[in-house]
């Protein structure tokens, strides 16, 4: 077969660019797993391994991409359709997308291992910056007795007051999950949380035929078992998916400006307009509206300290 002429190559390139610019996603494939060195894409129900043009930069799970097939079961990603609502992580000193085109973030934790509200706050800031809806899921609620449940409710009271949803349930006992499942329906949801809180068990609960999916991914890879160390998308139905991000305990926030971090704490941010200085750090400046609110007890000291810790990290 003869090689394409420069004119033919340019015509093909321009056609692809026009499709991407127009947002014509009818032919788009979906990135369902990123294995670091290789992508797995869903091309209208067919699972394929894929490489990508390095000039495209980093690719995220749930990206809509334009592909060409260089082999019957292998593709090349030629372009990325415009992204909506993207979460990022820091990797090797660079900011890279974790997942794109997402609707909401499910922050998962459990009484064992115990959680830290500071970690929950980091996830909330990431959700705020991505303009996605966050909610909390406290798994292993069967481990609570009346006293420890009351203590947990007290620790989470600030989030209730701020209007965030908090779901309680037990994957092990399959109780308290109906409302949460309804919240997930029809949405693209990233699930996050520290190891041992039951994320994998929850995904297995939501997707009973998960083994079929992982076998399809393994077949596309051509060898071995599907990795659990990289982000991947689990389709629950045609309109619903869970995106797991193993190893990401806290999305990177170091790229955010000080004001962007503060805006992720809305109950604190509302007092910044009372500060004398526009660039107030809310620590030692005179006439600081945030400090006055803190002294009055109008904002949580724990939340304030959490915010200042995130701000300090970005200055290192």
From Swiss-Prot:
SUPFAM superfamilies from the UniProt entry: P-loop containing nucleoside triphosphate hydrolases (SSF52540)
EC number: 3.6.1.-
One BP term from GO: ribosomal small subunit biogenesis
Annotated localization: Cytoplasm
Cofactor dependency: Zn(2+)
Biased composition (Basic residues): 8-18
Gene Ontology molecular-function annotations: GTP binding; GTPase activity; metal ion binding; rRNA binding
Predominant location: cytoplasm
Record PROSITE patterns: ENGC_GTPASE, G_CP
Note on cofactor: Binds 1 zinc ion per subunit.
Entry keywords, A to Z: Cytoplasm, GTP-binding, Hydrolase, Metal-binding, Nucleotide-binding, Ribosome biogenesis, RNA-binding, rRNA-binding, Zinc
Residues that bind Zn(2+): 275, 280, 282, 288
Assembly and oligomerization: Monomer. Associates with 30S ribosomal subunit, binds 16S rRNA.
Role, per record: One of several proteins that assist in the late maturation steps of the functional core of the 30S ribosomal subunit. Helps release RbfA from mature subunits. May play a role in the assembly of ribosomal proteins into the subunit. Circularly permuted GTPase that catalyzes slow GTP hydrolysis, GTPase activity is stimulated by the 30S ribosomal subunit.
Family named by the database record: Belongs to the TRAFAC class YlqF/YawG GTPase family. RsgA subfamily.
UniProt name for this protein: Small ribosomal subunit biogenesis GTPase RsgA
Organism, as annotated: Dichelobacter nodosus (strain VCS1703A)
């Amino acid at each position: 077969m003869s090689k394409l002429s420069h004119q033919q190559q340019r015509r093909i390139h321009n056609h692809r660019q026009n499709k991407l610019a127009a947002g014509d996603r009818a032919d788009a494939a979906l990135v369902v797993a990123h294995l670091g060195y290789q992508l797995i894409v869903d091309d209208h129900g067919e699972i394929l391994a894929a490489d990508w043009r390095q000039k495209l930069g980093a690719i995220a799970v749930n990206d809509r991409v334009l592909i060409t097939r260089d082999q019957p079961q292998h593709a090349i990603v030629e372009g990325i359709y415009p992204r909506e609502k993207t979460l990022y992580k820091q990797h090797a000193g660079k900011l890279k997308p974790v997942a794109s085109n997402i609707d909401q973030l499910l922050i998962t934790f459990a009484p064992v291992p115990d959680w830290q509200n500071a970690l929950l706050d980091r996830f909330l800031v990431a959700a705020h910056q991505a303009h996605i809806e966050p909610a909390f899921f406290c798994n292993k609620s069967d481990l609570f007795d009346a006293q420890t449940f009351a203590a947990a409710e007290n620790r989470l009271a600030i989030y209730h007051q701020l209007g965030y949803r908090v779901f309680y349930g037990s994957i092990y006992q399959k109780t308290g999950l109906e409302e949460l499942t309804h919240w997930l329906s029809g949405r693209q949801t990233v699930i996050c949380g520290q190891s041992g809180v039951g994320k994998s068990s929850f995904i297995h609960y939501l997707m009973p035929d998960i083994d079929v999916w992982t076998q399809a991914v393994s077949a596309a890879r051509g060898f071995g078992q599907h990795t659990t160390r990289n982000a991947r998308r689990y389709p629950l139905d045609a309109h619903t998916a869970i995106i797991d991000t193993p190893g990401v305990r806290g999305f990177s926030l170091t790229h955010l400006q000080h004001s962007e971090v503060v805006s992720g704490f809305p109950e604190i941010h509302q007092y910044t307009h009372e500060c004398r200085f526009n660039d107030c750090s809310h620590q030692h400046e005179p006439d600081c509206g945030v400090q006055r609110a803190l002294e009055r007890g109008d904002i949580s000291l724990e939340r304030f300290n959490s915010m200042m810790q995130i701000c300090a990290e970005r200055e290192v």
